[in-house]
Regions:
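Long, well-ordered core segments of solenoidal/helical folds
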Residues: 34-54, 88-105, 137-156, 189-225, ...
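Oxyanion-binding "anion nests"
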Residues: 246-295, 299
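Inter-helical turn/loop segments and adjacent helix faces that build the functional surface
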Residues: 81, 182-193, 252-264, 317-325
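CBM-like carbohydrate-recognition segments
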Residues: 30-66, 80-87, 96-114, 118-120, ...
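Acidic/His metal-coordination segments adjacent to aromatic residues that form catalytic metal sites
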Residues: 50-53, 98-105, 156-161, 221-235, ...
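Bacterial Sec-dependent N-terminal signal peptides
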Residues: 1-30
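Extracytoplasmic mature domains of secreted/periplasmic and thylakoid-lumen proteins
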Residues: 109, 114-174
Length: 411
């Protein structure tokens, strides 16, 4: 926990010095509790991090999937409710990170990391608004990574170059929705089959029939110490990995034509995931555990990022007709559980979301075994972007369901 304390101290120290200098100092330091939850969380994040590059506790510039996740959700809030400051906040990160020639600060294509692709999704919208060619070039640069990204024999992308032969559920979210949207926006219909294959391939490699869950990852080569020698699968089903996978479905399906071969197979898998989410929901709180296949076990805990991801995916899945309307009850119970158990509001109305796993992975230089003790002992922190972003998205779905029509200041 010490590392998190130090990071938070540094971030807060930097922010206190920058607050008076930031154009967002005009943003009220109080949050109106009468506003919708999605807007309240966005305004709270903008208070915590006056400069958008500071999201995810960053003391310096970083091109990262967390920024993409949060800024995408913020643009959704802007689209629904207005407030130009929200758009400008997202634009500031894009303008800072994308150079005039379309290169991206801190992005190294040759690393072949799917994590670096996710932020491209909000850049689509920035380009759509600005028509600045540098964003079009940046999108093409990220898309070109996928042409040469290392793959397994079945066409599945490696999660990263440093993780050879490995398929992580996290990576499906990081790469596939961007891939699908790029194909849609650029009339590259031949790519849909490859996008769909990423989902189907991940399901084949990670499904655990004994526990009826999808495990965090699979090493197709069976060489990693964390991998089962027969299946190649990791030891457990990590909540957030399943959350990433579920969100990937509902976001990518937006762009894949209904007639496309294999799309129906995606829907079958997503329906299976929805049934797993329903079965694993904690009956008392409506939430989900950090390690899904050990729900309720000693040391396991109800975790906010997977809970918000599941709720968003179910809400959107029902709205889009991907899953049965009966799942709406599961989503509503989960959303209310999030508000009751994870959301805190301070005296100024600033909203926080608590109890998020900061990070979890497999292998690496400081080796991560992927056993039960590993997952339950990773750092837990508040206002992690991987909980904040999906909470905003889930809240927007809830507000759409309630037909909330609050008009936020559009100046």
């Amino acid at each position: 926990m010490g590392g998190t304390y130090i990071r938070n101290f540094i971030c807060n120290f930097i922010l206190s010095g920058l607050l008076l200098l930031s154009p967002l100092s005009m943003f009220a330091q109080r949050v109106d509790s009468n506003l919708p939850w999605s807007v309240r969380m966005v305004e709270s994040e903008m208070i915590r991090c006056p400069e958008s590059w500071q999201l995810d506790f960053q003391p310096k510039l970083k091109w990262d999937y967390c920024h993409g996740l949060e800024l995408q959700s913020m643009l959704d809030v802007y689209d629904r409710y207005g407030n130009r400051k929200i758009y400008d906040y997202a634009l500031a990160y894009a303008d800072t990170m994308v150079n005039a020639d379309g290169t991206i600060k801190m992005y190294k294509r040759e690393e072949y990391s799917l994590d670096r692709i996710n932020s491209g999704k909000f850049i689509f919208r920035i380009y759509e608004q600005t028509k600045d060619e540098k964003y079009k070039k940046a999108l093409a640069l990220m898309r070109s990574q996928l042409d040469e990204h290392p793959r397994n024999a079945d066409g599945g992308f490696w999660h990263k170059k440093i993780y050879p032969n490995q398929v992580w559920l996290d990576g499906i979210y990081m790469g596939a929705p961007f891939y699908a949207e790029y194909a849609f926006r650029n009339n590259q219909g031949d790519d849909y089959a490859d996008v769909i294959n990423q989902f189907l391939m991940a399901a084949r490699h990670t499904y655990d029939p004994k526990n009826d869950v999808y495990r965090h990852a699979c090493d197709v080569s069976r060489k990693e110490r964390w991998a089962d020698p027969v299946t190649g699968q990791s030891k457990h089903s990590w909540g957030r990995a399943m959350g990433w996978y579920a969100m990937a479905f509902v976001d990518a399906l937006d762009f894949i034509p209904k007639h496309e071969a294999g799309r129906d197979s995606m829907l079958v898998i997503f329906n299976k995931i929805a049934s797993q989410i329903k079965r694993l929901q904690d009956s008392k709180t409506g939430l989900w555990y950090q390690v899904l296949d050990k729900s309720g076990a000693p040391g396991n805990y109800l975790e906010s990022s997977c809970s918000t991801m599941f709720v968003y995916s179910l809400f959107k899945g029902v709205r889009k007709g991907y899953i049965d309307k009966s799942y709406l009850e599961v989503a509503v119970k989960g959303y209310k559980g999030i508000l009751d158990n994870f959301i805190e509001v301070d005296k100024n109305g600033v909203v926080s979301i608590t109890k998020a796993c900061a990070v979890a992975g497999l292998g690496g230089k400081v080796y991560r075994s992927g056993d039960y003790d590993y997952y339950i002992n990773e750092t837990i922190r508040n206002n992690d972007p991987k909980a904040v972003g999906p909470f905003i998205l889930a809240s927007l779905e809830w507000e759409r369901l309630q037909d909330v029509k609050v008009i936020v200041n559009r100046k």
